[in-house]
Design a protein with these regions (language model features):
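Extracellular/periplasmic, surface-exposed regions of secreted and cell-surface proteins
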Residues: 1-196
Length: 196
């Protein structure tokens, strides 16, 4: 007489960030320093169930059916943590230097491979502000060289968790453990992207 199913999911995110900035000017020397820390947590909950043999097609609640078809629930958690530092310097708005470093951890990876270090640096020269630059048809001309790295853990969440995992099923009223057919990889770590 029909099947009725219900599901419910809930998610929350928490971000906890701190920054400490210091800026100072000495004549034409400008210095800007920053250190910071950030923690992020994502947690998901999911619950579902279905029953058959409905008492009425107008009653779409689980209480309106008598035979349990399936039930299920799970929860997942994902965390990242970052420590960072950055320094910026310029002289007379003509010569520029920048450097940053970040130490980043992710629960997507095995504890032995959880942390990665990423850095970036750049230098610039504003030629159009030099006294000898007299090309009036150029408003601004700047030379810049930079290199940077960043890490990516998306698409790899929980991949290593499948190592040594078992599924639980019902075998004639008894608990049966079945080895997971999905193999995890404890060696996975951050994907590092570099850009010049």
């Amino acid at each position: 007489k029909g099947i009725v199913g219900k599901s419910h999911s809930r998610q929350y995110d928490l971000t906890f960030a701190q920054r400490l900035n210091w800026r100072q000017t000495y004549g034409q020397h400008n210095i800007d320093l920053m250190i910071g820390h950030e923690y992020f947590k994502n947690r998901n909950y999911y619950l579902s169930g279905s029953k058959s043999n409905m008492s009425s097609q107008g009653n779409k609640e689980l209480d309106g059916a008598i035979n349990v078809q399936s039930t299920g629930s799970y929860q997942s958690e994902y965390n990242t943590e970052s420590w960072m530092a950055r320094a910026m310097y310029d002289y007379a708005d003509r010569y520029f230097a920048y450097g940053s470093i970040m130490r980043q951890g992710s629960s997507a990876f095995h504890p032995d491979h959880r942390w990665g270090t990423f850095w970036s640096a750049s230098a610039g020269w504003m030629l159009s502000k030099e006294n000898w630059f007299n090309a009036k048809w150029v408003d601004e001309l700047k030379l810049k060289a930079s290199y940077g790295e960043n890490g990516n853990d998306q698409g790899m969440r929980y991949s290593y968790y499948y190592t040594g995992r078992y599924g639980i099923s019902n075998s004639n009223g008894n608990i049966a453990l079945t080895p997971s057919t999905t193999k995890g990889n404890e060696e996975l770590t951050w994907e590092k992207n570099s850009k010049f």
